[in-house]
A protein has these predicted regions:
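SF2 helicase motor core recognition
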Residues: 12-16, 47-52, 60-85, 89-108
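A conserved SF2-helicase RecA2
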Residues: 88-175
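Residues at the C-termini of beta-strands that transition into short coil/loop
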Residues: 39-42, 85, 115
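Alpha-helical structural signal in soluble globular domains
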Residues: 18-26, 99
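Conserved helicase ATPase core of P-loop NTP-dependent helicases/translocases
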Residues: 3-5, 13-14, 20, 29-69
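Residues at the starts of beta-strands that form the adenosine-phosphate
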Residues: 1, 34, 108-110
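Hydrophobic/aromatic beta-strand patches that form the interior of the parallel beta-sheet core
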Residues: 36, 82, 112-114
Length: 175
């Protein structure tokens, strides 16, 4: 079973539509069918039903909005998790991966970030990794990222965007 994270809703709905009729078998030998989406638009009641179906092995692909699925969801049954775009901070990435890496998890999960060479996403990834390394060296506890306030997370996002833009301006000036 697979989870796809994305900050934007349209790609999630398009992906779910593409795979709505697909069938397969999970590692328990249970047949799964189709896909589901969790975004901020999905009601709490429907969200719980989608999660229950995924955890029961009834759904093969779960498309999740990074913000909507970052907290309060446990999905340890997933075997693969793809990031169509990058979370804005190491804390956001830790929140997403933390939904899958739980006690009671039955299998390993592979996390795949879809990055194209020479894109803004690649540069953002470099900056995010640098910040995570600095944070880990200074604080030593990546779990502390989960305790970052909304204001601090917003400041981190703004800082990353500023650094990416400045990097592109420097690269353009040097060329």
């Amino acid at each position: 079973q697979c989870i796809v994270f994305c900050a934007f809703n349209d790609p999630l709905y398009q992906l779910a539509e593409t795979f709505k009729d697909h069938r397969g078998t999970n590692f328990k030998g249970q047949e799964w069918h189709g896909s589901a989406v969790i975004t901020g638009k999905v009601s709490k009641k429907k969200r719980y039903k989608i999660i229950d179906d995924f955890m029961a092995g009834k759904t093969g692909l779960l498309c999740i909005g990074t913000v909507a699925g970052g907290l309060g969801i446990d999905l340890p049954i997933a075997r693969f998790a793809y990031f169509l775009d990058l979370p804005w901070s190491p804390a956001d990435f830790e929140q997403c991966t933390g939904r899958i890496l739980r006690l009671g998890q039955e299998r390993d999960c592979q996390f795949i970030k879809l990055l194209a060479a020479g894109t803004i996403d690649q540069r953002m990834e470099e900056i995010i990794q640098t910040k995570a390394t600095i944070f880990q060296e200074a604080i030593g506890d990546m779990g502390a990222l989960e305790r970052v306030t909304a204001k601090e997370a917003d400041q981190m996002r703004r800082s990353i965007v500023t650094q990416v833009i400045q990097s592109y301006i420097r690269d353009a000036a040097a060329a």
